[in-house]
UniProtKB/Swiss-Prot annotation:
Lineage: Bacteria, Pseudomonadati, Pseudomonadota, Gammaproteobacteria, Enterobacterales
The protein's name in its UniProt record: Protein Smg
Family assignment from sequence similarity: Belongs to the Smg family.
Organism: Yersinia pestis (strain Pestoides F)
Database matches in NCBIfam families: PRK03430.1
InterPro entries for the chain: Smg
Disulphide bridges, residue numbers: none
HAMAP family per the UniProt record, alphabetical: Smg (MF_00598)
Length: 157
């Protein structure tokens, strides 16, 4: 499912954000590209829930939390998000790429993936997808895009 999400993001969302979505056409295009229908449907459902979260239609608790509150991860969240991923989320909060509401959307969408454990690169993609359509997060999206596609051209001395 995650490969489908990245393909969708790179092909449709990121390159053509104003495009009207014809879910049947996208499903057919993805099937023609070699993705399994189950993965396609799971990815489209994942994106639909993300859109609902971004519009505030689901999980209204996201908007009532104290921004200064410390996030305590559940056991299951710790299993999925190793120390490096949790540290990266904290880093994103500290540099103000993520606010508490976006952080909770990221964690919600991570937990909805069908992967037992998420690596740092996958987390970066999820953060980018979450930030993509949240009004007011345009600068955060650009910062995250730079972090995702950052290439270290420096030399070690």
């Amino acid at each position: 499912m995650f490969d489908v999400l990245i393909y969708l993001f790179e092909t449709y969302m990121h390159n053509e954000p104003e495009m009207l979505v014809d879910q049947d056409k996208i499903t057919d295009d993805l099937a023609d590209a070699g993705f399994y229908r189950e993965d396609i449907n799971n990815a489209l459902n994942w994106l639909e829930v993300l859109a609902d979260l971004q519009e505030g239609q689901k999980a209204p608790y996201l908007y009532t939390a104290d921004p200064q509150a410390l996030r305590i991860y559940t056991v299951e969240e710790c299993r999925r998000l190793g120390a490096a991923c949790r540290g990266f989320i904290l880093f994103l909060e500290q540099i103000q790429v993520l606010q508490f509401d976006a952080r909770e959307m990221v964690i919600d969408r991570i937990m909805a993936l069908d992967s037992p454990e998420i690596d740092l690169e996958d987390l970066k993609w999820v953060v980018l997808m979450v930030l993509f359509n949240i009004p007011g997060y345009e600068n955060a999206y650009k910062q995250m895009e730079e972090l995702l596609f950052e290439v270290n051209d420096g030399y070690l001395h």
